[in-house]
């Protein structure tokens, strides 16, 4: 047998073995489809002369600008420290969207529109902005809230099965809402501004200066605006000290702690863990998202502060109080390590309500602030309301949000 014939027979004998090896080789899997996202258009360069100047690039200011741009208005967005800065009330990593809103129908009616707006933004962002989670509210003894639409009452007995990581009293009656959410704080503000296609400007904006000859407001760089929205929260007292005294509107401090669950412990993450407003004990918590830990804080702020200068560090006394609450409500977390902490501020009015009204003597200048604990998550609906007022000067102001209520 010649060499060529031997090689041919050897090749034919090896062919079945090669085929078997090929069959055993696993199919190559295609990589998972990327998260749906759309490319955002770049922000347009600021124009000198615009329809509306928005002062304050927090959640309410960002959504006000967003709605104004969608309505066809030319907008400039100013913030003295820059959008999403560390001093802002909007700078925290997460915020709660609570459908219960303490049983207050005025704010509960803003939840659906806000949820939908945050969800649309989240669907177009590179990272999630809205994380759905159930929310629970344990009323205080003096509370008699009527459950808003979409909110049910649950007994402590049933909740022990659904959320065993929380200690429930058998006689507790808790308000449970399915359509709650956590909003990604500072990241959500920046995404809103990107989606509005407005370039935020780090500019210190003074009280309004009206050029009476042109009937336009003069901006710091010589530009003009037909109207101004001051959505700068606690900084309103610096701009309008004669109207908004500290007794009427102020920055209030909350001390926040993030507690880290153990390795592989997912019972403190959504959907296993809800957001929880414990009015019975005066504390609130948000579940662990993105590994940031379970966030806990006392629901009632502990002091009035200067938002420009107060120290953003939490203190040991507040930590001891928070651990005491955890030992009663979430005993397995009571000794968990603190993985992050901060002192943050929010803006509160004397009535506890939002302020949304015109500046006296300036029918095209709007003041927006207050509603501590609510304004961030409801910012899409609040911003829509502000934009509607700008478009329709005859639109009536919500009586509970009127400036005159603070002047009494």
Regions found by a protein language model. Give the residues of each.
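N-terminal secretory signal peptides and thylakoid transit peptides that target proteins
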Residues: 1-14
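N-terminal Rossmann-like FAD-binding beta1-loop-alpha1 element of flavoenzymes
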Residues: 52-76
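Short hydrophobic core segments
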Residues: 55, 224-235
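Active-site substrate-recognition segment that forms the wall
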Residues: 67-70, 128-130, 234-361
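Glycine-rich FAD pyrophosphate-binding loop
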Residues: 70-89
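Dinucleotide-binding Rossmann-like beta1-alpha1 core, especially the glycine-rich loop
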Residues: 93-166, 170-173, 282-283
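A conserved short coil-to-beta-strand element within the FAD-binding core of flavoproteins
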Residues: 201-216
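C-terminal catalytic lobe of FAD-dependent flavoproteins
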Residues: 332-408
